[in-house]
Amino acid sequence: MDVAVVRSNLIDEQEALDRIISGISLSDWDLDTASPGWSVADQIAHLAYFDNAAALAIASPDEFQESVQKLLEMYSRGEDAEDAILSPYRTMRPGELLEAWRDGRRNLSEKSYNLSADNRVVWYGPSMGSKSFLTARLMEVWAHGQDILDAIGLKREETDRLHHIAQLGFITRSWSFINRGQESIDTPVKVILKSPSGETWEFGPQGADESVSGSALDFCLVVTQRRNLKDTSLEVFGSAAVEWMKIAQAFAGPATDGPEPR
């Protein structure tokens, strides 16, 4: 799958969430989400900020690095960098915030148009290949969209765009351990998932004795830490597979724990 396909799927995922957000009530924007201290509006603000940050990282890496340094300096002074990110958006009304997110998406779409497979993009931490970079953005909009859906009490029709997130979840297995300062477990684990369209997706060596199997949706919910493993129908066999699913983290940033069982 080439970069253009991932970019197109990212845009489709953003538009799918836009259609949901466009239909909610004004009061829904103020609902609390699973992220402590974050409302539905804050989830959209987060996406808007980082879509623009991603566009800046592509178009002007040096300027992006300067912005990262400013955030790090805020953290080192004990200041709330997260609040600084969200504050400008918290003054906006829902309609204005929605337009701000749309502007950020357009900005990212334009800046990413000419990315090729051999391009790398600077980011928070190591640089990323362009395909992985856009896949991470797709994962973010899907995961934060899930937070919004859970808060409002809605469900969405899942698509095979989940393949991007499932693959990201699989390849970040070692990262999930290393990010916690733990040694990665080398025991092979195969992942067998049923896609929304009914296809079977397989990751990892077929001869592996340990496995994770079930719906692609459940797997994606676990690796993005939107559901506890116990709240899914995933079948996990083997100690290495179990340990992975306990701490799976497909996204960058400090190590975090998934939700408690519902």
Give names to the regions the model predicted.
Residues 1-45, 54:
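An N-terminal domain-cap segment
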Residues 7-10, 40, 98-101, 134-137:
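Hydrophobic packing residues in well-ordered alpha-helices of helical domains and bundles
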Residues 207-262:
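C-terminal interaction segments
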Residues 30-73, 123-179, 219:
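Short, contiguous alpha-helical
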Residues 1-5, 52-109, 113, 161:
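Short, helix-capping/interhelical loops that line the mouth of catalytic, cofactor-
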Residues 14, 18, 22, 51-55, ...:
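Structural signal for well-ordered, non-membrane alpha-helices
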Residues 21-33, 105-133:
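Acidic interhelical loop/turn segments
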Residues 180-223:
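Glycine/small-residue-rich hydrophobic helix-like segments
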